[in-house]
């Protein structure tokens, strides 16, 4: 390679602003995917997690938390110095790649403003990584890399691509996430060998009819753009396995989506969807369907034909009922989220509809009763969230929920907990905050696996002595009650790491509590009388 590479002129444009990790993955928790907030399963490129949620981002796993960058950052040198140093490194890498005839070139995170045109000499390359740079354009010479299979361009400031890229007949993966594209570059539609296309977090408003030319696509991610509709031609992508259109402005889906029968993951969360086509029932391979945060008022009956569905998230829509028998037909469903809708009662369908459910989230609805026997066949139900409903009592068979591990009944109108709570022997987390409880049953002492017990904002006047049997308890929240004394046995809870006693009527503590003062952070304030 010519030594003229060292004389490449430095670009003097300002460094573009790169969105923070919080901005890129703001949603969710939940959240996931779909309830853990959308987890976009993108492959990792060297040194970078190519993922969402978390989804989401979240990507965020519906569901489904995200990591924090704790990297120590050294002071930046003067801008001019950085550019010269960056170019020198690039030249060194290009020369090394040519001399070693390497098929892989990683130029990520080099603060590159302009890729040297001499890159065209590296025709042996099959992988080129340019993510996390400061590129505003690509030189046409990249089109000379006719053996490229992978081209990673995420986290730059690209607004277009050169037409010469249509020479890349072998390209299978193109990553354009986190750029400044206002449209899908026309050359992308001519890359007919593509199997994976990432366009997440751009400014794209339209998907053209030419998308049909990318018939080999198995993964298409166009989440976090400004797309208002998908063309009917999307139905010609018959090899699609994952379609991620979350965080856009879709109001409807084309009926032709039903032709994409290989899809297993369909993420439509955070759009403006008003309805779903009946043809969605043709997606016989569908295992994950994310519809949280839309404007749906009904679910088509045809969804019952999606018998492979494992996860269904309908959080934050306007749904008040489900088609009768829908859940019973989804024989592989393990995770169901119906939170933040308009349900006034449990879905019609009887006990069989929950026989495979592991996690059920009905939070923030208007449900006033859990029907007797509704979980009689729910042998694997481990997580139930009924927070923020209108429950005044619990069903008589409450004590038969023996597989329950996490139970959230917060923010209801419960006045008592049945004595047969003692039957919930697998319970590890019990949330009863914001209710009207005046006392706890003695059977609470049988929950030997309990790690967290939250009783904040009730009307408790005392605690049963049996609470001393909860030896695994790590968190006990009793804040905002009417307690005047504590049982002496509380001193036996040596695994506690958090004890909340604030806003009660306590005038003294039992001597035994001194045994645990050295083992945990003591969060307490007194209201003396």
From Swiss-Prot:
Keywords: Cytoplasm, Leucine-rich repeat, Nucleus, Repeat. Residues 1-29, 36-57 have a biased composition (Basic and acidic residues). Its main location: cytoplasm. GO terms for molecular function: protein phosphatase binding; volume-sensitive anion channel activity. PROSITE patterns: LRR. InterPro entries: Leu-rich_rpt, Leu-rich_rpt_typical-subtyp, LRR_dom_sf, LRR_domain-containing, LRR_R13L4/SHOC2-like. It is found in: Cytoplasm; Nucleus. SMART domains: LRR_BAC (SM00364), LRR_SD22 (SM00365), LRR_TYP (SM00369). GO terms for biological process: cyclic-GMP-AMP transmembrane import across plasma membrane; intracellular signal transduction; positive regulation of Ras protein signal transduction. LRR repeats lie at residues 99-122, 123-145, 146-168, 169-191, 193-214, 215-237, 239-260, 262-283, 284-306, 307-329, 331-353, 354-377, 379-400, 401-424, 425-447, 448-471, 473-493, 494-516. Transmembrane segments: none annotated. Residues 1-87 are annotated as: Disordered. Coiled coil: none annotated. PANTHER family: NON-SPECIFIC SERINE_THREONINE PROTEIN KINASE, PTHR48051. Core component of the SHOC2-MRAS-PP1c (SMP) holophosphatase complex that regulates activation of the MAPK pathway. Acts as a scaffolding protein in the SMP complex. The SMP complex specifically dephosphorylates the inhibitory phosphorylation Raf kinases, stimulating their kinase activities. The SMP complex enhances the dephosphorylation activity and substrate specificity of PP1c. Belongs to the SHOC2 family. This is Leucine-rich repeat protein SHOC-2. It comes from Gallus gallus (Chicken).
